[in-house]
């Protein structure tokens, strides 16, 4: 095949890959400000993104019906326990299709030590980029900028290195 023809045939694939990689968490683009959001937590209180200014924090969109979400939860707990005394926090947002009673039961049974919020209306998932795949996890820096978006289970060793750099 001629080099020019090969280039023309591969160009659409390269464009698609360049567009899709950031969406899939395959590479980091410039940090952007986290959307201003209000999280209604299980105890009925609320937190906002402004409450986390000055902290490094993890935002995890998950569901009790998501096997990957359930499997990664012990590592999210471990990460929270490891860094929470150093200016780190975590918010786990249950998707709108997750029955609140299931979320409450899950959080109580596993003793989740961090903020667990309900997204009853789907507004949070929409505000954070029309989240539909779970788990989807964001790492936010002390200035409130999204520094990483991960679709699927994070590489927790790499995530810990990133958290260490940001703290």
Predicted ranges, named:
Residues 108-113, 120-164:
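Thiol/disulfide oxidoreductase modules built on the thioredoxin-like
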Residues 34-35, 57, 134-135:
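Short loop/turn microsegments at loop-to-beta-strand junctions
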Residues 1-14, 18, 22-25:
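N-terminal secretory signal peptides and thylakoid transit peptides that target proteins
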Residues 70-110, 120-126:
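Structural microenvironment flanking redox-active thiols in thiol-disulfide oxidoreductases
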Residues 25-49:
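N-terminal "domain-start" segment that seeds a small globular fold
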Residues 49-67:
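Short active-site neighborhood of thiol/selenol oxidoreductases, capturing the structured segment around
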Residues 42, 52, 142:
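Short, ordered coil/turn segments that flank beta-strands lining enzyme active or ligand-binding pockets
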Residues 58-60, 92-94, 138-139:
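Hydrophobic beta-strand core positions in alpha/beta domains
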């Amino acid at each position: 095949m001629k080099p020019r023809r090969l280039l023309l045939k591969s160009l659409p694939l390269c464009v698609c890959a360049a567009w899709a990689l950031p969406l899939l968490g395959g590479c980091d683009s410039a940090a952007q400000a986290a959307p201003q959001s209000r999280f209604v937590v299980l105890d009925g209180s609320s937190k906002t993104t402004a409450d986390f200014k000055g902290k490094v924090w993890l935002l995890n969109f998950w569901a009790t019906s998501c096997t990957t979400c359930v499997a990664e939860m012990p590592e999210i707990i471990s990460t929270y326990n490891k860094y929470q005394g150093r200016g780190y926090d975590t918010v786990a947002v249950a998707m709108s299709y997750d029955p609140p009673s299931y979320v409450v039961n899950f959080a109580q049974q596993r003793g989740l030590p961090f903020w667990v919020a309900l997204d009853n209306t789907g507004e949070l998932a929409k505000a954070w980029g029309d989240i539909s795949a779970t788990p989807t996890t964001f790492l936010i820096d002390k200035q409130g900028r999204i520094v990483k978006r991960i679709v699927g289970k994070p590489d927790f060793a790499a995530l810990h290195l990133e958290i260490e750099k940001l703290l």
